[in-house]
């Protein structure tokens, strides 16, 4: 965002002009959008533990075989690894959301994740379901406008959903 500000100022300075109302309006819109992004990410970060825990509970309620003896989340160590992985995906989704770009999610989280899960014998379809459950919880939080500036956030909510969809597809 600072690059955009610097660019507009440099252009005006090169022309020896003050910033125009149009330029100021565009920068103001960019700040407003940035504030909405921050609100969405703050809601996710503030509720990350609940998002992960509740999503895992819902997954295990639907797929109890995962937590039964022989299941991929059976034993405390495996359960902790499952929750850790869910938290990592959620964290990188929040990074992508604040950046407005999926490259950090792709490069640092998703690339090679399917292969890793296959090598470990982790069912990708179950991971995908867990990611979708985190999406549902995160989108619900993003849609809750309590205590946040008013305005249309539908594009940001759709963008947020797309990052979760990207993660869910990458593991199956």
Curated annotation (Swiss-Prot):
UniProt entry tagged with the keyword Cytoplasm: no
Residues engaged in binding (2R,3E)-phycocyanobilin 2: 153
Positions that bind (2R,3E)-phycocyanobilin 1: 82
Signal sequence, start to end: none
Modified residues (N4-methylasparagine): 72
Post-translational modifications reported in the UniProt record: Contains two covalently linked bilin chromophores.
Swiss-Prot/TrEMBL keywords: Antenna complex, Bile pigment, Chloroplast, Chromophore, Electron transport, Membrane, Methylation, Photosynthesis, Phycobilisome, Plastid, Thylakoid, Transport
Family matches, as CDD domains: PC_PEC_beta
One term under GO cellular component: chloroplast thylakoid membrane
Alphabetical list of InterPro entries matching this protein: Globin-like_sf, Phycobilisome_asu/bsu, Phycobilisome_asu/bsu_sf, Phycocyanin_b
Biological process (GO), any one: photosynthesis
Chief localisation class: plastid
Membrane-related topology note: Peripheral membrane protein
Compartment(s): Plastid, Chloroplast thylakoid membrane
Subunit structure: Heterodimer of an alpha and a beta subunit, which further assembles into trimers and the trimers into hexamers. The basic functional unit of phycobiliproteins is a ring-shaped hexamer formed from two back-to-back trimers contacting via the alpha chain subunits. The trimers are composed of alpha/beta subunit heterodimers arranged around a three-fold axis of symmetry. The phycoerythrins also contain a gamma subunit which is located in the center of the hexamer.
Entry function: Light-harvesting photosynthetic bile pigment-protein from the phycobiliprotein complex (phycobilisome, PBS). Phycocyanin is the major phycobiliprotein in the PBS rod.
UniProt family annotation: Belongs to the phycobiliprotein family.
Protein name: C-phycocyanin beta chain
Encoding gene (name): cpcB
């Amino acid at each position: 965002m600072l690059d955009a500000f610097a660019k507009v100022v440099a252009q005006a300075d090169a022309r020896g002009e003050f910033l125009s109302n149009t330029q100021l309006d565009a920068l103001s819109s960019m700040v407003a959008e940035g504030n909405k992004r921050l609100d969405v990410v703050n809601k996710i970060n503030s509720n990350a533990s609940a998002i992960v825990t509740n999503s895992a509970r819902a997954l295990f309620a639907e797929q109890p075989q995962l937590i039964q003896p022989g299941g991929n989340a059976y034993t405390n160590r495996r359960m902790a690894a499952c929750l850790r992985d869910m938290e990592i995906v959620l964290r990188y989704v929040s990074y992508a959301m604040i950046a407005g770009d999926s490259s950090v999610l792709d490069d640092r989280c998703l690339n090679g994740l399917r292969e890793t899960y296959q090598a470990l014998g982790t069912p990708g379809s179950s991971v995908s379901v867990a990611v979708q459950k985190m999406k549902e919880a995160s989108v619900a939080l993003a849609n809750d406008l309590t205590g946040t500036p008013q305005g249309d956030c539908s594009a940001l909510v759709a963008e947020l959903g797309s990052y979760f969809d990207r993660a869910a597809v990458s593991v199956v």
